[in-house]
């Protein structure tokens, strides 16, 4: 299996060198790092090439790396039922970059790209209807970004007196604690109640 994926990686790199930045194999799947501008062309090639035949788009998602200059990885998961292989394409983009849509190659990408836009704020050029999919029309921010507050900005509830849905600022029962997610986690300096292991030392 690994040998077949290695052969496939070499073939794709040889046939489309302008698209492939690098590739590796992890968890039984071929991972290819792609230039964002070339993603649509590479996906089309992978669909029609007889050695590939990745005709099924399984998913499009993104990963947020706030410490990087190219903050997001847009990740495409493709399946070849003919070759019984999976492939993962990764395109690293800055926050303000736009990624070409692949709706013309895989119509099912329509909702996947809308979800990525809604959750991460990544824009897709050439998308026929790029609007929010999972959040409300007036929603502020993008919930899967790591800098989005866990409480959100507003809460929604039905007001019986007004007979309509109302938006209100978030009111917390306890004071909001801001955590620095970029720092390594450190435990308490003191022994916690009920921690018999520490007392036995």
Swiss-Prot record:
E.C. designation(s): 7.1.1.-
Chemical reaction(s) catalysed: a quinone + NADH + 5 H(+)(in) = a quinol + NAD(+) + 4 H(+)(out)
Keyword Acetylation applies: no
Recorded GO CC terms: plasma membrane
Keyword flag Transferase: no
Alphabetical list of Pfam families matching this protein: Complex1_30kDa
Catalytic class of the enzyme: translocase
Keywords: Cell inner membrane, Cell membrane, Membrane, NAD, Quinone, Translocase, Transport, Ubiquinone
Superkingdom of origin: Bacteria
First-listed, main subcellular location of the protein, grouped into a coarse class: membrane
Gene3D superfamilies found in the cross-reference section: NADH:ubiquinone oxidoreductase, 30kDa subunit
Sample GO molecular function, one term: NADH dehydrogenase (ubiquinone) activity
Binding partners and assembly: NDH-1 is composed of 14 different subunits. Subunits NuoB, C, D, E, F, and G constitute the peripheral sector of the complex.
Function: NDH-1 shuttles electrons from NADH, via FMN and iron-sulfur (Fe-S) centers, to quinones in the respiratory chain. The immediate electron acceptor for the enzyme in this species is believed to be ubiquinone. Couples the redox reaction to proton translocation (for every two electrons transferred, four hydrogen ions are translocated across the cytoplasmic membrane), and thus conserves the redox energy in a proton gradient.
Protein name, UniProt field: NADH-quinone oxidoreductase subunit C
Organism listed in the record: Ruegeria sp. (strain TM1040) (Silicibacter sp.)
Lineage per the UniProt record: Bacteria, Pseudomonadati, Pseudomonadota, Alphaproteobacteria, Rhodobacterales
Gene behind the chain: nuoC
